[in-house]
Amino acid sequence: MEAPPTDFFRSLLDRKSFIDILGQGEGKIGGALMPLPDGVWGMPEGMVQNLPGYSGDVQKNREEARALMQKAGYGPDKRLPVTISTRNLAVYRDPAAILIDQFKEIGIDGELETVETAQWVPKLIKKDYKVGLNVLGTAVDDPDVYFYQNYVCNSARNYMGYCDKEFDKMVDQQSMEPDPVKRKKLVWEIDHKLQEDFARPVIYHLRAATCWQPEVKGLTMMTNSQYNGWRFEDVWLDR
């Protein structure tokens, strides 16, 4: 028996349920880059909905996934056992549990393997997993940061080993494009290609918020990053 097709993964996901459960409805469905309107570079809604598995018709998509599984020799009488590996933190375990539950809908019995933090990235680098669920963030919502860091050949964080020389040329091209409108269209094409190539399946983008006491002064929140304002060199307490 040949290995089951990975194409089933495109069709099984109910992405909205991840957002409803994990983010209380606060989140967006998109590609690699931060979706609109929160992000600057996200694909237009029409491009997103045209991606395989993104139509929103979960029932129809899962029927397609079941058909792919049956074609590979799996079904109600022969379910596929799969280990889902993830980091042993709640923000990783919770979506992994939802993924396992959704796997059941198409005849896959998932078993959760939790990995301690010190071993998680080495495990990803070695590709020592069948299905790995990872939570990914980037310092700045910018294509150069995201594409070069995660997807070009030989990138240190290209954990899935995706390598397409034509893709790398497209990334270089958008980086050198001085016209912001033209660059944005190139970025959309690149992101669309990543999702079609199944380079690293994206499930959801959740929103994050920051709270602070009134006596905290001098804190400037970043408009395109969750992480780049935490040096606190200008922050003081008015007490």
Model-found features: residue ranges?
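Cysteine-centered nucleophilic/redox motifs
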Residues: 9, 16, 92-108
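Long beta-strand-rich cores associated with HINT superfamily self-processing modules
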Residues: 210-239
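Extracytoplasmic/peripheral linker and loop segments enriched in polar/acidic and small residues
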Residues: 3-7, 11, 19-22, 31, ...
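Structural transition elements
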Residues: 29-71, 89-94
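Short, well-ordered beta-strand elements
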Residues: 79-88, 111-113
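Short helices/loops that flank or line small-molecule/ion binding pockets
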Residues: 97-106, 118-129
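Paired acidic/hydrophobic, glycine-rich loop segments that form the ligand-binding mouth/hinge
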Residues: 130-135, 202
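Beta->alpha turn/N-cap motifs
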Residues: 15, 34, 117, 134-139
